[in-house]
């Protein structure tokens, strides 16, 4: 019997199962790490790697192989899944070190570490994700107790754990447990608290509050220093937020579940920031939080050298970039953007260029445009405008050398195309029609395309041709999603 569309859509979770997502392109452009389940009806998301040169895919970690395929999430991880609208089980997110040699992820409140250099079995995606020789989870080890002799090991952390992130050097993994921000040293197994709410109800470190995750596209609450010596972390106090009580219509005998929900016009969570050094120093970051209570985002990039905060007023008419002195917590104004209606939040900024310039977006000449400059230039209003008013910037995707990668709309607002802007020129990297996203590193371009010609997104890896030839496809990440 042929499936009806509603049945097929339900069985495939809206045709999302088997579709690759959450890509991470290594800095050398040689490897792509991503998430995907084994098939169009498989609800367990796995961790994969693509070798760009050979085009081979490797299955790095399958929660079924570590006995966590159907593990229940703790309330924090469940809330994180809800924020990103993730319905499948397994691995919802991962993070890597700067060199993409290790990846950390949490399943069922347990932290796992995967060796991306040698782990994984070759997989034929066209054959439905079956392993081609070897185990389904890779070989090799990073040390400590491994899972099933594979390159994926369970870290002996406090549980339940959420949002594990390796430091850029790959020496430590930070994570959040019971509202405390903790750090695990990989080599020794030492695990300790870096920021502790000390049992206070409604207070947590290192997690994004409800408004940040739902309205600002910020799903994290801490950022490693580039050298791994400290963490910039948020402290969220939800005690002012009102409770809502949600009943289960399918089980009227159950008590309603109480959750804190900041509905419009009611008190929000109070967010503050701290620099927590691995040496034990704990320094509060100071700014006018009464006038600018929203923490929109933060960053700590090696090229800039110190943390940057983006904060905004509650009416969203005033948004500012603040530079943070990590030694004292003192902030200084980098730039301020105001609007009588509101200032748009653009994902991906601030970003840093190798020479220390700060990339931002601003409304200039009736369009959202990319601007870049040193902090003094932003403060003086002399930052360079990199894009014309004929395109409207949607998102900054990152930087590659001195070029800024971003998405924008030109004549057709229904099309979102990929562009790069730098000292040399402005260039569109995708076709004009469709919705695209991308990552770029060392000249390698990972292009995600969605068009009316295909029900599934295509994921291609392209590299520049020789002697001025156009970019050519060198690899492709397969989709195992069903066709409607």
Residue ranges and their predicted role:
Residues 1-426, 434:
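Beta-propeller folds
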Residues 22, 435, 439-484:
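Serine-hydrolase catalytic core recognition
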């Amino acid at each position: 019997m042929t499936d009806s569309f509603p049945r097929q859509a339900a069985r495939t979770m809206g045709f999302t199962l088997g579709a690759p997502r959450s890509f991470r392109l290594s800095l050398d452009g040689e490897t792509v790490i991503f998430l995907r389940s084994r098939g169009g009806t498989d609800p367990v998301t796995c961790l994969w790697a693509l070798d760009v040169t050979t085009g081979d895919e490797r299955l790095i970690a399958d929660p079924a192989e570590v006995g966590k395929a159907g593990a229940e999430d703790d309330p924090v991880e469940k809330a994180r899944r809800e924020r990103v609208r993730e319905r499948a089980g397994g691995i919802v997110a991962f993070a890597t070190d700067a060199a993409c040699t290790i990846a950390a992820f949490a399943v069922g409140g347990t932290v796992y570490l995967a060796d991306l250099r040698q782990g994984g079995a070759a997989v034929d995606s066209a054959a439905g994700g079956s392993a081609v020789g070897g185990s389904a989870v890779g070989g090799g080890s990073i040390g400590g107790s491994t899972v099933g002799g594979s390159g994926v090991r369970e870290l002996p952390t406090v549980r339940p754990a959420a949002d594990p992130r390796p430091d850029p050097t790959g020496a430590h993994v930070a994570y959040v447990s019971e509202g405390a921000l903790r750090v695990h040293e990989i080599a020794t197994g030492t695990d300790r608290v870096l920021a502790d709410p000390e049992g206070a109800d409604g207070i947590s470190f290192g997690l994004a509050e409800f408004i940040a995750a739902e309205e600002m596209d910020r799903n994290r609450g801490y950022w490693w220093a580039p050298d791994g010596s400290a963490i910039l972390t948020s402290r969220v106090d939800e005690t002012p937020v009102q409770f809502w009580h949600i009943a289960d219509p399918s089980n009227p005998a159950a008590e309603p579940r109480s959750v804190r929900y900041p509905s419009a016009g009611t008190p929000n969570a109070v967010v503050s920031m701290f620099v927590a050094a691995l040496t034990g120093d704990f320094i509060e970051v100071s700014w006018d939080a009464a006038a600018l209570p929203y923490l929109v985002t933060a960053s700590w990039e090696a090229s800039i050298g110190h943390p940057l905060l983006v904060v905004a007023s509650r009416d969203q008419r005033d948004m500012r970039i603040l530079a943070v002195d990590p030694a004292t917590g003192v902030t200084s104004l980098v730039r301020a953007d105001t609007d009588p209606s509101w200032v748009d939040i653009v994902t991906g900024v601030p970003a840093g260029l190798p020479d220390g310039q700060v990339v931002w977006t601003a409304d200039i000449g009736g369009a959202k445009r990319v601007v870049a400059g040193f902090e003094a230039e932003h403060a003086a209003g002399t930052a360079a405008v990199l894009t014309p008013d004929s395109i409207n910037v949607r998102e900054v995707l990152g930087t590659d050398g001195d070029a800024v990668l971003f998405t924008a709309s030109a004549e057709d607002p229904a099309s979102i195309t990929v562009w790069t802007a730098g000292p040399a020129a402005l260039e569109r990297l995708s076709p004009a029609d469709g919705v695209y996203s991308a990552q770029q590193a060392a000249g390698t371009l990972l292009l995600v395309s969605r068009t009316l010609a295909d029900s599934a997104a295509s994921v291609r890896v392209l590299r520049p041709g020789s002697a001025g030839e156009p970019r050519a496809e060198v690899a492709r990440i397969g989709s195992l999603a069903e066709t409607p």
